Each structure stands twice: as structure tokens, then as C-alpha cells.
Amino acid sequence: MNTREIKDTLSIISRVTISKIADKQLRKDLFNDYLALSKASKAFDEDIKTIQEKAFEGIDLNAHNELVAKIRKAESKGDIEQAENLAKELNPDTVKAIRDFNELYEEKMNEEQEIELVKIDTETFVDAMAEQDFAISMQELETLTSILK
């Protein structure tokens, strides 16, 4: 299962759990909050894609990655001179673009983590409410059963 499938599965589970809450307004509010969080998560994925496209526009990442692999191979063999010579071939614009992208990506990941934490808090609250409603329902059922006896 990839990340998207896992998120989709969690989304379905959360919606089912939300549907178990008896208080209609609370159920509606929680469902709307959950939808908003899901949209924010989707927007995050699209933001990262856009940032990546802009950051690496006109840059040959494959060539850069091949050169980095050669540098690492030379270093692992202990050939520091060859590694240094290969490092001189690195395009400074590509290196800067990668650093800039990594900084932006890290910022976005922090935002995504905050979204996920809120989502988890919401899911935990929803689960607790559903359990509480279920417990109340069981109590009501037991009361009715004892009255009928």
C-alpha cells in the first residue's frame, strides 16, 4: 500500500467513525473539519509538486545525480583527488536549486506534520465520542431490557 492508499483508507475509517456519533451537529462539524484537513493535505501534495517543478526547471537532475554517484564511488575507494576533481564539475546553480528546494520542502513537511497532528487529534476525539455514544446506547439498552423483564 502506498501513502495515498493508506490516507484514503484512514479517511474512510474516520468517516465511518464520525457517522456513529449521535449528536447530529457535532457529527456535521467534525465531518466538515475532517474534509478541510483532507483538502489541506491534498493541497500540500500539489504545492510540493509545483515547488519541485519550478525549482528544477531547466536543470538536468539525472546528470547531477550521476556525477554525485561518481564522487561517492571515488570517495569510497579512497581516491580523494578524483572525488575533488569530479566535485569541481558540479553545476553551482544545480547545487543551489537542490538546497533551496530542500529548505522549502522541509518547511512544507513541517506544515504537513501540523496538519496530520490536527487530523490525528480529530480522529482520536471522534473515536472517543463514538465510544461514548456507543456506551450510552448500551446503557440505554440495558435499562430498557431491565424494564421489560
Residue ranges and their predicted role:
Residues 1-149:
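A composition-driven surface/loop motif
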